[in-house]
Amino acid sequence: MEWNKGFSASYYMAIVDPVTWRDTDRAEITGGNIERDESGLMQSASIDCVDFPDEELYVRIYLNARQDGDADHVPLFTGIATTPDDDFNGGLNSNTVECFSVLKPADDVLLPLGWYAPAGVDADIIIRQLLDITNAPVDIEESAPYLKTSIVADEDDTNLSMVQRIIDAINWKIRISGEGVIGVYPKSADPVVSFDPVTNDCIEPAIKVSRDWYSCPNVYRALDEDLSAIARDDSEESPFSTVNRGREIWMQDTSCDLADNESIAEYAARRLKEEQKAAITASYDRRFHPDIMPGDVIRLKYPTQGLNGLFRVKSQSIELGYGAKTSEDVTNE
């Protein structure tokens, strides 16, 4: 499939066996939306359908795409469907079903008071134990680093919130596939796809772009176990410096990822420089592409709109209608 060209789209919903994770029954849908982002439960769906069972079920939403004799069958979302809302029109009963992501069971259970993730243990072991409460398959790269410091659960921490704290500590990411597989991987700066007006034009002309340098730091404190360092920008040549802005704007890092032979002071200076750039946020609609999820990096080459470089996807909304139109928010790397 050439996703930058037009295709016809149809959709259906499968009931999923929570044990085998395979499709069983099938239900027709008439529309809806799928929401994706980087935080919380990360995914949700609102599905319009007819005669949906009045019970909690695992479901999977599929896109059937056809283009000039080619066809593709793409799972868009797998999650837990709640009890449907009913809309009666004479003898016809239509439903709107709200669906949670496969992470919901891990968000519903509080950790015991006093629970902690111990330092020195491989992060993948703890993450897998915390996610075992879900029915979804879990895929974690074997090279997950160990925790440098213990992470003690707060009184309102759930299995999921602790997983997210561990993910932040090791600077990795969670990526939920359309099949509902929970993936835990290192963050990557490599783009999964490139968009430009000539060779791969998927983005609609209306693009909203905002720029913000207000929160750029000019003082950076790095804390790594018993080491610490502070880097400052007091240069008269720098637009972000304490001199030119007339005040200090601090940023602190407690999860330092030092390069080989890099001192904590060198790390603080490097990170200060990396953080001193204007934040660019862009919002647009585009044609559907199956390989892009929140947290992924894409390359945009739209210089007229001021978008030329690497951007990380923050959120998506997929409309289950013509062409699976995708609304997307991105920020510059």
Residue ranges with predicted function:
Residues 67-99, 175-176, 298-329:
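Short beta-strand and beta-hairpin "edge-sheet" elements
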Residues 51-137:
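Surface-exposed cap/loop segments at beta↔alpha junctions
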Residues 38, 47, 99, 112-139, ...:
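Amphipathic, non-transmembrane alpha-helical segments in extracytoplasmic/periplasmic proteins
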Residues 1-10, 164, 168, 178, ...:
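Acidic, small/polar-enriched beta strand-loop surface segments
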Residues 22-59, 105-106, 110, 117-121, ...:
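Extracellular/virion structural assembly segments
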Residues 1-28:
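Polar/acidic, low-complexity leader/linker segments enriched in S/T/G and N/D
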Residues 2, 76, 89-106, 142-216:
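Short beta-strand-centered interaction patches in the first periplasmic/extracellular domains
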Residues 33-52, 92-105, 222, 254, ...:
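Oligomerization/assembly interface segments of phage tail-like spikes and tubes
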